Amino acid sequence: MVPSLVAPAVATAAAGCHGNACEGRSPKATGCGSDAQTIPGTVTHPGSGLHPQVWLRYSKQCDAVWAQGEESNGWTIRVQLDGGASYDAPTVPSGSAFTSMVGAGHRHRVGVLDADGRWSYGAWRKGGI
């Protein structure tokens, strides 16, 4: 008997978009959220008290980023392209909220709209992790 040289198939999630083609699309619907990582140093904390945390998430397989916020009600989170589009999402009392994506190859930042109607932003950055 000859040993088999065929390896078992490994299931991988196929990304629904890549780079700029992800702009305006959902990280969940495209499968881009499956390999997402939080980019270090991108957490924004406006004010004090029970304010939402918002951070930048990056998908290597999709080369895209988006804003994600946790467990807060009545706030809006944003991912913004430098000189381009912004994508917003309302936060929710339980669970996480996320914006649509933008390609990671352009300068981008995350922000949160506070109760006084002011935006607080993280630093501009380009690329993934």
What are the roles of these predicted feature ranges?
Residues M1-T12:
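Secretory targeting and sorting signals
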Residues T12-I129:
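Post-signal peptide N-terminal regions of Sec-secreted extracellular proteins
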